């Protein structure tokens, strides 16, 4: 479960780089949305991993 949390975190960081780096207007908006979605998923899976221990 912690592995999924790390994967979602890496995806969130990649989405942040594209979203906040000014690549393209349309892609940046999509990346910002994906960034927040993946951060929430990361936190949920991180909490589930900690609780299951």
UniProtKB/Swiss-Prot annotation:
Pfam family, one: DUF1328
Residue ranges of the TM segments: 5-25, 30-50
Keywords: Cell membrane, Membrane, Transmembrane, Transmembrane helix
Localization, UniProt: Cell membrane
Protein name: UPF0391 membrane protein Bcep1808_5731
Protein family membership: Belongs to the UPF0391 family.
Membrane topology label: Multi-pass membrane protein
């Amino acid at each position: 479960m912690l592995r999924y949390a790390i994967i979602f975190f890496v995806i969130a960081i990649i989405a942040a780089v594209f979203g906040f780096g000014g690549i393209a207007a349309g892609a940046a908006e999509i990346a910002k949305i994906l960034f927040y979605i993946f951060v929430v998923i990361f936190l949920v899976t991180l909490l589930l991993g900690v609780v299951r221990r």
